[in-house]
Amino acid sequence: ESNQGYVNSNVGIELARYETTNYTESGSFDTDLARFRGTSDSIHTSRNTYTAADCATGYYSFAHEIGHLQSARDIATDSSTSPYAYGHGYRYEPATGWRTIMAYNCTRSCPRLNYWSNPNISYDIGPDNQRVLVNTKATIAAFR
């Protein structure tokens, strides 16, 4: 799903690898993290072998977290304009509404589209996370 979001938004990067693991979440972040540190050591081995910088999935969460690593911010109502004033997700709220990968949920809940905010793709909007990702992709690729 992450790579498809990059294609949909003309980002020009591709995530190189993913793995699945047989794990049932406990409902507690602290418990899950402790289990990863003691009983799921294969996660750490794979992370080091393949120089992974992030681990997550579900409802575009992995792409969302990668976006933060690349300096993309959540939504334009976030008062921070650093490092990119244009680098926010987008949320459209009339009627049922929708939101891009980085945007918070709508007031009345709305679907998250597998798109990065990009005024040149599907919706004529101002925020432009696609440009943030393009600007930072070489730095991220060279991370590990």
From Swiss-Prot:
It holds the Pfam family Reprolysin_5. Its EC number is 3.4.24.33. It catalyses: Cleavage of Xaa-|-Asp, Xaa-|-Glu and Xaa-|-cysteic acid bonds. Keywords: Hydrolase, Metal-binding, Metalloprotease, Protease, Zinc. Binds 1 zinc ion per subunit. The keyword Mitochondrion does not apply. Its cofactor is Zn(2+). It comes from the Bacteria. Zn(2+) binds at H64, H68. The active site is at E65. GO terms for biological process: proteolysis. GO terms for molecular function: metal ion binding; metallopeptidase activity. Belongs to the peptidase M72 family. Metalloprotease, specifically cleaves on the N-terminal side of aspartyl, glutamyl and cysteic acid residues. This is Peptidyl-Asp metalloendopeptidase. It comes from Pseudomonas fragi.
